[in-house]
Amino acid sequence: MGKVIGIDLGTSNSAAAVMMGGKPTIIPAAEGQTAAGKAFPSVVAFSKEGELLVGEPARRQAVTNPDNTIIAAKRKMGSDYTFKIQDKEYKPQQISSFILQKIKKDAEAFVGETVEKAVITVPAYFDDNQRQATKDAGTIAGLDVVRIINEPTAASLAFGLDKAKEDMKILVFDFGGGTLDVTIMEMGGGVFEVMSTSGDTQLGGTDMDKVLIDYIVDEFKKKEGVDLSQDTTAMTRIREAAEKAKIELSTVMETDVNLPFIAHDPSSGAKNLELRLTRSKLDELIGPIVDRCKPSIQKALEDAKLSNSDINKIVMIGGPTRIPLVKKFVSEVIGKEVESGVDPMEAVAMGAAIQAGIIAGDVTSDIVLLDVTPLTLGIETLGGVREPLIERNTTIPTSKGKVFTTAADNQTAVTIHVVQGERPMATDNVSLGSFNLTDLPPAPRGVPQIEVKFDIDANGIINVTAKDLGTQKEAKITIETKTKLSEEEIEKLKEDAEKFSEEDKKKKEKIDLKNEAESYIYTTEKLVNHDLKDKISQEQGIKITDAVKEVKEVLDKEPEELKPKLEALQSIVNEVTTELYKNAAPPPGADGQQGADGQQGADGQQGADGQQGADGQQGADGQTTESSSNDETKTN
């Protein structure tokens, strides 16, 4: 099996890692370090020319192209929401697949081989719709998603808690850009068992950004009398500045927000936004958001039947956990200091890589990961009541069945409506789908015995079977969630993704050819205007200059136009320099000179004084000298 990578597909930032030399190593993004370190922004954009941009390049142009830029797509995973960009609609899975496609490409460049398999993490509180959408995104990106694991489980692996000698109970506080997960795990004898999980899929660092953005907008309005909230470009700049200030205030006590020319007044001209932010002001603004985390901590403890004092370790992951107020809050709620030593922005990806390494056989480990289902699974019964089959926080993989009957006389079919959630009425929970068991023999109500059985695999994906115990007739399905894509849809989206990949390849080829042409033009002009100025004829000079001009005119054109012009220029230069070389060479056999058989260089004709060879490569000085020891020709 080839390399299996671990991926943290985040709301605000994403990261990937792979096992190298027995250790998880973060895969660097092609664009290098970002504000988030080795992670990169989960931002997707389309330029005005339709070019796909992912990561830091997408984030950088968001100010000037906000309408075609998508942030926090993960918050829409599992829903039927669509993003409208340039008269085209994109599903959340497709936007996420662009991020995963970039990760795949970066990983292949890093490990030097094709990467086809991945372990992807999801928030522990993700329902089946969201998990299935994540798998679909991986498939569209050309990845075989061999395992979906919960982010807290991955983080615990990254912190090395599997190597602890004593049994322990770990609270993982996962506060990301868009979701909060609080998970309590028990570790002992190499077994990680999730005892409980709680959280909020709509609470995260982006909520902090929002209150900070609102504060900046309000302060500017008070000072300048201008409301920037409806100015898309201004708001994009402010959002970027707010996120930057939030990150900076994690390590310094104050920072300045400076946004010149943020607005224009016809009477007074351009207006600049200048504001000093302090950590205390940030704490004041985000305090209510941090307080909203407390119920999730309490619920996780309650479900695990534990008290604060039972917790041995606290693991913090996610960008917002770098904020001192967040660390202090969790520490005070539990009454224990938090663990350190692993970057909270990288922990999940590193843990996913460890799990990937176990699957690939790169890591020898006795670790067993036992996750739980985050929400209760059940079906809708008479009157719209939800009947639970698998309770929340049940260890998975698992299987459980229950026998039901018909609600009417002579009923020949039943509809099984599967729901996920904690509300007593089916309509108040998340609908995962429905299916029919048909051709039942007519019978009085209450007589047929229909067993409904739920199977949940290690990825949290649900399969349901309904069987008539009288006739043994059964229907088996994998839950087709409302957002699950058909094979045809996935194939089409894969083709779209490959199209963008092909466009990227063509773009690179175009840039490489342009760079080659510009370099050749520079060298040629140097030859004509300096090195060979007194050695070439006027006719030769005009011929070369005209050819250079023709290349310059098509520098920004497609390779089909540029390449023939460049080759024509190279041919003219080679022809002129070869003629000069022949004219300058003394007759064969002259004392100490290289004979005719020494004129051929390694890759083409060797030119005088730095001339180009046939393959376009430049020699250092181009002079040929005879070696006194072995008669070989070499370039000085």
Curated annotation (Swiss-Prot):
SUPFAM superfamilies: Actin-like ATPase domain, Heat shock protein 70kD (HSP70), C-terminal subdomain, Heat shock protein 70kD (HSP70), peptide-binding domain. GO terms for molecular function: ATP binding; ATP hydrolysis activity; ATP-dependent protein folding chaperone; heat shock protein binding; protein folding chaperone; unfolded protein binding. Keywords: ATP-binding, Chaperone, Nucleotide-binding. Gene3D superfamilies: 1.20.1270.10, 3.30.420.40, Actin, Chain A, domain 4, Substrate Binding Domain Of DNAk, Chain A, domain 1. Signal peptide: none annotated. NCBIfam families: PRK00290.1, prok_dnaK. Acts as a chaperone. Belongs to the heat shock protein 70 family. This is Chaperone protein DnaK. It comes from Nitrosopumilus maritimus (strain SCM1).
